[in-house]
Amino acid sequence: MELRPSAAELCRENLRRNGLIGTVVTGELGGRYPELPWGGYDLAVANPPYFPQNTGKTAPDAARALARTEGSYTLRAGCEAASKLCRNGGKFALCLRPERLAELFAALADTGFAPKRLQLLQPSAEREANLALVEAVRGGKPGLRVLPVRIER
C-alpha cells in the first residue's frame, strides 16, 4: 500500500528488477481493496513514516513530509493492516527509527504478531543506530533474535 503514485510505481519497478512477485496498491490504508484478499499473503513489507505527528525535522517539501511524518498511516494502523492481510504464520517486515521500537512492539502484540528478528543499522561505528529492521510473525510464539548491528559506511 503506497499513498503516492510515483512511489508505488518505484515499488513495482523494484519488484520487477529483483524478480519478485508482489502486489503494490496506491491508496489509503483504511480503505478496502478487492485486489488485496484478507489473509492471503505470506509477507507484508512497510516503510512507515519515521516520526509521529508534530515531531522530527520539518521536511523541505510536501512529498517528504508525507513520507517522514505520520498522518493517516500510524504504526498501529500499519500493524492492523498487516494483520488483516497476512495469513497465520505470515511475516511482516518493516524499518523504523529505534526510538519507536517500544511503540511498535506494543502495536505488534495488540494485532497478533510476535517480533522475531531485530537488526539495528548505524551510519558509522562512532554514531548511534538510526534505523531498526524488524520482522514479525502473525500468530508467532515469543522469542526475539537480535542480530549483530550493521554499520553502513
Where does each model-flagged region fall?
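Conserved SAM-binding loop
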Residues: C11-R12
